[in-house]
Amino acid sequence: MSLDKIMNEAISPWMKGDGPDSDIVLSSRIRLARNFKKYQFSTMQNEEETKQIQELFKKEFINKTVEPFGEFELLKMNELTPLQRRVLVEKHLISPNLAGTEYGACLLSESEHISVMLNEEDHIRIQCLFSGLQLSEALQSANQIDNWIEKEVEYAFDESLGYITSCPTNVGTGLRASVMIHLPGLVLTKRISRIIQVIQKLGLVVRGIYGEGSEALGNIFQVSNQMTLGKSEEDIIADLKSVIQQIIQQEKMARELIVQNSSIELEDKVYRSYGILANSRLIQSAEAANCLSDLRLGIDLGYIQGISRNILTELMVLTQPGILQQYAGGPLGPEERDYRRATLIRERLRIEKN
């Protein structure tokens, strides 16, 4: 695996799979926050300590195969251009926070479904991504990587509190589990606000597609646990999975209601969006996201035939500003991005239909 391959292949291999409930759940993510006993927290570290952590990973974990994940590549933020960092964020491989650091780094697996962020808010954050609703599978992979790393380093751990982290909400298991979920039915029936309120009362967090502070573009929401203290990893996963399954049922009911009461209006909405995507010469990211959401809904309901349902996930990533500019070989103005976005979508749909 090389940096060029990571940058030039916008769609990570894990995105191409179909997991359970993938008609509504786009992806599952597990993140484990860990700190090393011998170093100060990242927020208090000096430059030398951050470099030591990078060198530790370069020495112990690079060019070593971990079954079944293969070899890992170390990407240092200060060796990447701002555009390359942005691409990694848009592919969900690193956080915006890590992209903004000079001494952060990312240990990335060949399939790109596992990344270990170094010198972010914590010394390391292990992230595992799976398609569909596969929280338990993602946790299993994260724990394998966690055990692999712990053979070489000693974590900051307290017998009564658990893993010690920079943010108090992560103390305990250090586990943040999240699910990316497509909810056009609940949005169209105007039930989404009530659902979000219920989710929040259960102690969960609802965010946009790129996490904290981001918009729910394309009717895609990210639902995650908040507290990690006092619960086991299995309990956190079970609680979140139970809520997600209820949301899935609510979304299915909302879709059925729309089909029963407004079938022709919904079909018209789907085909109008399909027409925009298939024929536009300029399209902004927000409009593209909304139209792609409609198209995906039309595919899931059987209105549109012959197009993969993965097209929403794929084109939501491919049409992000950073990836468009990476493909173009340099910076693009807003109108140039809109032109390239429209061209890419048209071409992708043409390939699907042929």
Curated annotation (Swiss-Prot):
A motif (RDXXRA motif of the pArg binding pocket involved in allosteric regulation) lies at residues 337-342. Residues 24-254 form the Phosphagen kinase C-terminal domain. GO terms for molecular function: ATP binding; creatine kinase activity; protein kinase activity. ATP binds at residues 27-31, 92, 125, 176-180, 207-212. It comes from the Bacteria. InterPro entries: Arg_Kinase (IPR023660), ATP-guanido_PTrfase (IPR000749), ATP-guanido_PTrfase_AS (IPR022415), ATP-guanido_PTrfase_cat (IPR022414), Gln_synth/guanido_kin_cat_dom (IPR014746). Pfam families: ATP-gua_Ptrans. Its EC number is 2.7.14.1. It is an enzyme of class 2 (transferase). GO terms for biological process: phosphocreatine biosynthetic process. Appears to be allosterically activated by the binding of pArg-containing polypeptides to the pArg-binding pocket localized in the C-terminal domain of McsB. One of its GO terms (cellular component) is extracellular space. It catalyses: L-arginyl-[protein] + ATP = N(omega)-phospho-L-arginyl-[protein] + ADP + H(+). Keywords: Allosteric enzyme, ATP-binding, Kinase, Nucleotide-binding, Transferase. Catalyzes the specific phosphorylation of arginine residues in a large number of proteins. Is part of the bacterial stress response system. Protein arginine phosphorylation has a physiologically important role and is involved in the regulation of many critical cellular processes, such as protein homeostasis, motility, competence, and stringent and stress responses, by regulating gene expression and protein activity. PANTHER family: ARGININE KINASE 1-RELATED (PTHR11547:SF38), ARGININE OR CREATINE KINASE (PTHR11547). Belongs to the ATP:guanido phosphotransferase family. This is Protein-arginine kinase. The gene is mcsB.
